[in-house]
């Protein structure tokens, strides 16, 4: 199977990428800087070292054949909203903009960092 629930149910390992995701992303909507900082101080399932995902990492969860949310069928995540989630990836052309991923459409988008979005923290490194 693609996903394995770990850390007493608090996290999910993606066996395809090697990344470990929060089983349930933040419920709070916040600006980019606070969202990124919150990941860095999180402890999930007794594990530290969480961080905000890059746009490429967050896109690995997307299943474009699914919509609302655009996640693989049978995924073990909870409280997934078909909303736009922050990534740690700033727009290299504009300091006030960062990349986000829409879990309604599955598309990456950009918006100002002053907007409020949810964050889905990750642990580990993406296997190439």
Q: Language-model segments: what does each one mean?
A:
Residues 1-51, 55-128:
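Glycine-aromatic-enriched surface loops/turns that form tight recognition elements
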């Amino acid at each position: 199977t693609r996903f394995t629930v770990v850390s007493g149910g608090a996290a999910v390992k993606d066996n395809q990428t090697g990344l470990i995701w929060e089983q349930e992303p933040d419920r709070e909507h916040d600006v980019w800087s606070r969202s990124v900082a919150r990941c860095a101080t999180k402890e999930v399932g007794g594990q530290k070292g969480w961080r905000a995902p890059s746009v490429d990492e967050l896109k690995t969860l997307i299943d474009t054949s699914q919509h609302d949310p655009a996640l693989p069928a049978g995924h073990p995540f909870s409280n997934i909203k078909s909303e736009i989630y922050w990534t740690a990836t700033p727009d290299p052309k504009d300091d006030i903009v960062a990349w986000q991923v829409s879990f309604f459409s599955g598309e990456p988008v950009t918006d100002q960092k002053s907007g409020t979005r949810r964050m889905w923290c990750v642990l580990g490194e993406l296997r190439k």
